[in-house]
Amino acid sequence: MKRIFLLIATNLAVLLVASIVMSILGVNTSTMGGLLVFAAIFGFGGAFISLAISKWMAKKAMGCEVITMPRDGTERWLVETVARQAQQAGIKMPEVAIYQSPEMNAFATGPSKDNSLVAVSTGLLYGMSQDEVEAVLAHEVSHVANGDMVTLTLIQGVVNTFVIFAARVVAGIINNVVSSNDEEGEGLGMFAYMAVVFVLDMLFGILASIIVAYFSRIREYRADEGAARLAGKHKMIAALERLRQGPESTAMPAQMSAFGINGKRSMAEMMMSHPPLEKRIAALQAR
C-alpha cells in the first residue's frame, strides 16, 4: 500500500513541477505544440539526467569498490584485462569495480565511452574460470564501445515523450467526450482528469517498456559478438553456459541490469532486457 501511495504521490509531484516549469517558460500545454514541448522536455530530460548520474547511482546502489590500487593478483589481472580490451575496442580505460554479491553478474554504465564503469560481482569473479570472466569483461567493454548507454537513453527519451504526450492527448479526448455529454460542460474535473492521466501513463508505460526491452535485446546480441571478437567465441559461449547453469539474476536494479551480463528471466520474452541464454549461445554458435 505504501509503495502504491508513493508511486501516486511521485507522479502527482512530477506533474505539479512540470506544470510550474511550463508556466514559467510560458509554454501553453493546452495546445498540441505546447504539450509536445512539455513531453519532450520531461521525456528526454529524465532519461539524460539518469544517464549523467548513472556511474554515481551504480556505485551507491551496488556498493561498488573501485579498484584504484590492486590489492592482489586477481584484482591486478582484472584491471589489466579491462585495460587491454578497452585498448582493443578503441575506448578510454573504464573504471573497474567489484561489488559484493553471491550471484554471477557484471554490468557496465556511464554517460559516455570515455567516462564509464565496468563492475563485476564477487560471485562471478570467484565462481567462474579466468577465461569465462575474461569473456564477461569483454561483453561489458563492448557495451561501452558500442555506445549502448547513450543509444538506449535516446530510445528511452523517445518512448518517455510518447507516453507523456499520448496519455494527455487521450485524457483530453476523454475529458471532451464527458464534457459534451455533461449538461454543465465541466468535463472530468481536475482530480478525475489526473487519475485518468495516471492510469494512461501506466498503460502506455508498459508498451514503452516492451519497445525499450526489444532494443535492449538487440544490443545484447551485439555485445556478445563484440565479446567473441575481443576474448574469443568459445570463451563467450562457455561463460553463457556457466550462467545458464546458475540461478536467475535478482539482485541488480533495473538500470544496471539492462547492461548486465545475466538478465532476469521472464515468461514473456518481450518484457526481457536480455534474450534467453539459449538463444544467445545459439547465435554465437551460428557465427
UniProtKB/Swiss-Prot annotation:
Major location (coarse): membrane
Active site positions: 140
Note accompanying the cofactor annotation: Binds 1 zinc ion per subunit.
Cofactor: Zn(2+)
Statement: the UniProt record of this protein carries the keyword Cytoplasm: no
GO cellular component: plasma membrane
CDD domains, sorted: M48B_HtpX_like
Keywords tagged on the record: Cell inner membrane, Cell membrane, Hydrolase, Membrane, Metal-binding, Metalloprotease, Protease, Transmembrane, Transmembrane helix, Zinc
Residues binding Zn(2+): 139, 143, 220
Top-level lineage group: Bacteria
Membrane topology of this protein: Multi-pass membrane protein
UniProt similarity note: Belongs to the peptidase M48B family.
The protein's name: Protease HtpX
Annotated source species: Shewanella sp. (strain W3-18-1)
Gene it is expressed from: htpX
